[in-house]
Regions:
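Active-site-proximal alpha-helix that buttresses catalytic centers in soluble enzyme cores
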Residues: 1-349
C-alpha cells in the first residue's frame, strides 16, 4: 500500500542577510536556466562578470530591512503554513525551497528514507511561469529520478482561477477594502516578454496583439499574463470592485530586455498625479510575504508613492497562514487522498 505525503515548495531565501550568503543564494537562483534563459556561457558571464559583483551587497541591505528574529520571513511563514496544514491532514507534510534550504534534494531524501512513495507536489505559485511553477516541478522530478524506485507524483496545477484561492484573497483583503481608499493596485511579479513568448507552444498568440490575454486561447494554460489578469478580474468581481478603482502593474524587473508593463514603480509615481492619493496595493502572485512584498512594496514602494504626492499607502499582506488559505490547501489534500484531485499527474514533465 502506498505511503503518502504532501510536499510544499516555495522560492527560498538566503540563510542570512550577509553578503556572502546572499551571493550564494543569488548564484543558485539566477543560475537557473529557467530564470535567466540564456546559453550557459552567457549566463555564467552575466552572473559572474556583472550581477554577482554588485547585486549581493544591495540585496543584502534589502534583506536586512525585513529579516526577523525567526529568520527569513518567507521561510518562517512557510513553516507556519506547513504546520497548520499538517495539523489538519492525516499524512506527513514536508516543506522545501527551490533555492537555498531546506533544499528539494534533502527533503526528498528524507521522505524516501521514511518510506514515502506517493507525493502530492504543491508548488506555492498561483500562476504558471517557467521561472516559478515550472522550475519547481522540473527540479523535483529531476531529483526524484535519483531514487530507485522513484516516488510517484501528483502535481497541483497553477490555481490562479480556483474559487478557494480567490475567496482566500478576498477574505484576507476585506478588512482593508472596507476602509476609505481611492485605488487598488494589483502588483504582480514581472516577467521578461521573451518568457511569455517561449511558453506559448503555438508561437502565434502570446504578445502578438493588444488584447491577446482577453481572447480565449489554449496558450493561456501557460501564459502568466493571461492568468494574472484572470486573478485580478475574478478578485474584483468577487469583491464587487468598480473597474475604475483597480489596475494591474508588474514589479521586480531586471535590466537588459523588455519586461511586462506597466511597471509598478512607474505607477506608484504616476497615481498621485491622477488623483489616486490613497492607495491599496495587493500582491497576489506571492502566497507568503517576502523580500519583494515587504521591502520592494511596503518600504520602498510606500516611500516612492508618498514622495510623488500620495497621502496614504497600504500594502495588503499576502495570504501567509490566513485561515481561508489553509482551508484551500486542505481541500486539495483531501481531494487527493480521496482519489479525486483537482490536479494532474506530472510524470510527463
Amino acid at each position: 500500500m502506498a505511503k503518502k505525503a504532501v510536499l510544499l515548495v516555495n522560492l527560498g531565501s538566503p540563510e542570512s542577510p550577509s553578503v556572502p550568503d546572499v551571493r550564494r543564494y543569488l548564484r543558485e537562483f539566477l543560475g537557473d536556466e529557467r530564470v535567466l534563459d540564456l546559453s550557459a556561457p552567457l549566463r555564467w558571464l552575466l552572473l559572474e562578470g556583472i550581477i554577482l559583483r554588485t547585486r549581493p551587497k544591495r540585496s543584502a541591505h534589502a534583506y536586512a530591512k525585513v529579516w526577523t528574529p525567526d529568520g527569513s520571513p518567507l521561510i518562517a511563514t512557510s513553516r507556519q503554513v506547513r504546520e497548520k496544514l499538517a495539523a489538519r491532514t492525516s499524512v506527513p507534510v514536508a516543506l522545501a525551497m527551490r533555492y537555498g534550504q531546506p533544499s528539494i534534494a534533502s527533503v526528498l531524501a528524507q521522505l524516501v528514507a521514511a518510506g514515502i512513495d506517493d507525493i502530492l507536489l504543491f508548488p506555492q505559485y498561483p500562476h504558471y511561469a517557467m521561472s516559478s511553477w515550472e522550475t519547481v516541478v522540473a527540479k523535483v522530478l529531476a531529483e526524484a529520478k535519483k531514487f530507485s524506485p522513484a516516488p510517484r507524483f501528483t502535481v497541483v496545477q497553477p490555481f490562479y482561477a480556483e474559487a478557494g484561492y480567490i475567496d482566500a484573497l478576498v477574505a484576507a483583503a476585506r478588512p482593508y477594502l472596507e476602509k476609505p481608499y481611492d485605488h487598488l493596485l494589483f502588483s504582480y511579479h514581472g516577467l521578461p516578454v521573451s518568457h511569455l513568448r517561449k511558453a506559448d507552444s503555438s508561437r502565434v498568440h502570446c504578445m502578438t496583439a493588444p488584447h491577446c490575454c482577453e481572447t480565449c486561447s489554449p496558450a493561456h494554460a501557460t501564459c502568466y499574463r493571461a492568468q494574472i489578469f484572470h486573478t485580478a478580474r475574478a478578485f474584483a468581481a468577487r469583491a464587487g470592485l468598480d473597474p475604475s478603482r483597480w489596475s494591474v502593474s508588474f514589479q521586480s524587473r531586471l535590466a537588459g530586455e523588455p519586461w511586462l508593463e506597466p511597471y509598478t514603480d512607474h505607477e506608484l509615481e504616476r497615481l498621485p498625479g491622477a488623483g489616486k492619493k490613497n492607495l491599496l496595493v495587493i500582491t497576489p502572485a506571492f502566497t507568503a510575504d517576502c523580500l519583494e512584498t515587504l521591502e520592494e512594496i511596503r518600504i520602498a514602494g510606500r516611500e516612492a508613492f508618498l514622495t510623488a504626492g500620495g497621502k496614504t499607502f497600504t500594502h495588503i499582506p499576502c495570504l501567509n497562514d490566513h485561515p481561508k488559505f489553509i482551508d484551500f490547501l486542505v481541500g486539495h489534500v483531501d481531494a487527493w487522498l480521496a482519489g479525486t484531485p483537482a490536479s494532474t499527474n506530472a510524470s510527463a514533465l
